[in-house]
Amino acid sequence: MLVETVAIERDVHDVYRAFADITYWKQVLPDVLGVELLYDDGRHQEFTMTVSRPGGAETVRGIRFCEENRRIELVQPQPPPSFRRMVGVWTFEEAGNVTHVKAERWFELKDASVGPLDGFRDRIATYLRTNLAHFKSHLEATR
């Protein structure tokens, strides 16, 4: 499991709303090339997202379960190439005028031939840290 955290100087509602609105990600994250929202009833979401990676564009299909202002769980029935499975969760906790966001990821590679596990772990951790930093910068700049 990988865990990354960030403290964002915004109330939990604004922070949660930014993470929950998957179409908004294209405005915040420079590597997101496109998002197609397939289903959203306010609690359950299904989407595809295409991101730019060093090896070219990658498209994933995700399903998210959202608990307003508390938590977003993710499963990717179509994970990134080289992965058999990718799941995760974001949790949101407000303390005063700061919201603490914790991003957790669990993954399984398709097989050992795709490369060393540590390299994938480091890459996913870097993407998580970078994404959290982009959300922090964007949300704190748009008060």
Identify the function of each model-found stretch:
Residues 1-43:
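Hydrophobic ligand-binding cavity/cleft-lining segments
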Residues 2, 32-35, 47, 74-75, ...:
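Short structured motifs
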Residues 1-3, 57-61, 84-88:
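Short, surface-exposed coil-to-beta transition loops
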Residues 77-130, 137:
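Beta-strand/loop substructures that line and gate deep hydrophobic ligand-binding cavities in soluble
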Residues 13, 99, 141-142:
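Surface-exposed interaction/gating patches
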